[in-house]
């Protein structure tokens, strides 16, 4: 097989793959996947911003907890982005795309207390958790729905941990 089949064609805007998911389902699912790529990249950066800049009671416990969250978010992000490519799409993860498409409001740079960070994080984790849960039923194939389900389980757990630390 030559490389001609591996480049984008105008006819479908999808990269060639032997995956038999219908092209229309692939396109809808790739859009959904890229929405979550944006969510997970932004949430992972916000998590690290809080991790670096918090001070006060329970610092070390929350600081270390957020490191674990960031690791898991990065794992889900990679799985989600790679699924978009597996379906013949392009994973959209540049800072320009994230900045223009994130549903998350800008994270405040002038807060320092653990409690203030936890409240800000809870709001943002809830947005992403709720959107991923919605994406499960919107996915056009079961494999993508499974990926979203795994991510949803972690996000719900992380939101619970964050909320449990808010005084």
Curated annotation (Swiss-Prot):
Stated name of the protein: DNA protection during starvation protein
This protein's record includes keyword Ligase: no
Under catalytic activity, the entry for this protein gives:
2 Fe(2+) + H2O2 + 2 H(+) = 2 Fe(3+) + 2 H2O
Main enzyme class: oxidoreductase
Name a single GO biological process.
Answer: chromosome condensation
Major site of localization recorded for this protein: cytoplasm
| PROSITE patterns reported for this sequence | DPS_1, DPS_2
For this record, an example GO cellular component is: cytoplasm
Positions binding Fe cation in this chain are 51, 78, 82
Provide the protein's localization.
Answer: Cytoplasm
Q: Which organism is it from?
A: Cronobacter sakazakii (strain ATCC BAA-894)
